[in-house]
């Protein structure tokens, strides 16, 4: 069956060839022959056929997204996939033998690969380039409209960054992009459906990447543009989060396809996204999970569920891509967050981590402290009542992480002399110069009556 659904047979192809017979005969005449007048079984002769034959010319193309060879024309036999299959190869061998006397299968295959590479195309680029934007801004409205997310600067910037990164990845494979947008909310909200529609073509979306240490991870990514990591985000822990960070930061895979001889660097053309039903899906990490950008969805606030009118939703998303292409062409953007959004994200991520009891204990102790300088040993002994214990290195490191990332009102200093602890690195209270230092209620002053 042809791509448009019509039944095609060799008799139909025969009619085409009959109309074009002079062309086929011209090709036969132009093929190189040996001293005995027989057709040379050379790559060059095979190339001549693939480049000039009325049936084959332009029909075999290298898909730069999938890395596979696609057949984009009607070759006269029933096909169920655009990608080249073993059956297609056998049919092509038969055709070249019958019409041109070319029988060397290895040389036919080599010529087919060369011809396909010379006629390469990128389906996503071709699709994006034919889009015409109607001038209406939609990128910032996508998540509020279909998933009930907050319509604010953060949501708008994250969504715009994701779409621009996806465009960059198909035009500049392997470009640096290290952020994973994670949609967080209850089951049935349409999170995965949103990402599937965002990929435009369902074949360009995948949620099949279960493990990052799989030897076939490239094959799982091959031909996909938007890749959802749902199962991994559902079981994430302190160790796996580091693995995910490292994985999404990679810009290429080095992989050898089984039938190829040499491994090849394959720059990434995809972006990774995540979904989670759990509010505290990020493990406790006081140094920050800057590669993860959570967006909370609210199914009860949606303007229209994404599956209520699939055609309308897909068209809306397509126009958002047209808008994104205008931004991409302008060149006035970077594939990173603004400083304001980075700072906001750092604080907001805490809402998606388990509660950190140590932060509360230290913050309360500091708020009631009269001194303006502290060090990690002082906090260990006084805030946690370990007066007679010697802190271990990892315990001091944990306190440092809390002070540097989770405590407000204090700034890091390089050194200070402490009466009981000597010269130490530590922290100094940030005092508003326009206000007097506010002491705890129980602290005595020089003016208190005795």
Task: Go through each PLM region and give its residues.
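N-terminal nucleic-acid engagement/recognition segments and initiation subdomains in replication
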Residues: 1-138, 153, 157, 389-394, ...
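Residue-level preference for alpha-helix termini and adjacent loops
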Residues: 55, 59, 64, 68-71, ...
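Feature primarily recognizes SF3-like P-loop helicase cores of small DNA viruses
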Residues: 94, 99-122, 176, 203-207, ...
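P-loop NTPase catalytic core of nucleic-acid-dependent motor ATPases
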Residues: 112-222, 226, 384
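Amphipathic alpha-helical segments that form well-ordered structural scaffolds
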Residues: 142, 162-166, 193-197, 243, ...
